[in-house]
Swiss-Prot record:
Any one Pfam family match given in the protein's UniProt record, by short name: GreA_GreB_N
Region (Disordered): 24-47
Domain of life: Bacteria
Record's keyword annotation contains Hydrolase: no
Gene Ontology BP term (one): regulation of DNA-templated transcription elongation
Gene behind the chain: greA
Keyword terms, alphabetized: Coiled coil, DNA-binding, Transcription, Transcription regulation
Coiled-coil regions, chain positions: 48-68
Organism: Christiangramia forsetii (strain DSM 17595 / CGMCC 1.15422 / KT0803) (Gramella forsetii)
Record-level Gene Ontology MF annotations: DNA binding; RNA polymerase binding
Protein name per Swiss-Prot or TrEMBL: Transcription elongation factor GreA
């Protein structure tokens, strides 16, 4: 059974657009590369043909995985979410107890994660540690160099 993932409407559209690009642009390119390599003669010693077939296999595997993700994707109506605790698509402001640094993140699905824009995956260590927390709670998060404690300062939705 595949895992259900939750997306914003924009995130799901981006995922579908990428899948359509793979099917409509990359798949025909892979077939064309195989055809060109096949036209070069003996297939038993044709490294170009072997490479093109392998690339096509990897592309088909990627398409298959993306189709599964899209099939199990659910769009979240952010206006209906509980703002009293951290959930997927929550914005959360946290404070590191060790150094006092404050950070703001939005928890999103793995495929929407982008640390530069402040979007972290709900499957990341920080994301997992924050899920279900309320304002005033302390999240203890295991990181490679130990445990970090964060205070939840604020939770909101856009």
């Amino acid at each position: 059974m595949s895992k259900v993932s939750y997306y914003t409407p924009e995130g799901l559209k981006k995922l579908r657009d990428e899948l359509n690009h793979l099917k409509d642009v990359e798949r025909p390119k892979a077939s064309e590369a195989i055809g060109e390599a096949r036209d070069k003669g003996d297939l038993s010693e044709n490294a170009e043909y072997d490479a093109a077939k392998e690339a096509q296999g990897l592309l088909e595997m990627k398409i298959s995985k993306m189709e599964e993700v899209v099939a199990n994707a659910r769009v979240i109506d952010e206006s209906q979410l509980d703002t009293s605790k951290v959930l997927v698509h929550s914005h959360v402001k946290i404070k590191n107890q060790t150094n006092g640094a404050e950070m703001t993140y939005k928890l999103v699905a793995q495929s929407e994660a982008d640390l530069k824009s402040g979007k972290i995956s709900v499957d990341s260590p920080i994301g997992k540690g924050l899920l279900g927390k309320k304002v005033g709670d302390t999240a203890e998060i295991e990181v490679p160099n130990g445990t970090v404690k964060f205070d939840v300062i604020e939770i909101w939705r856009e």
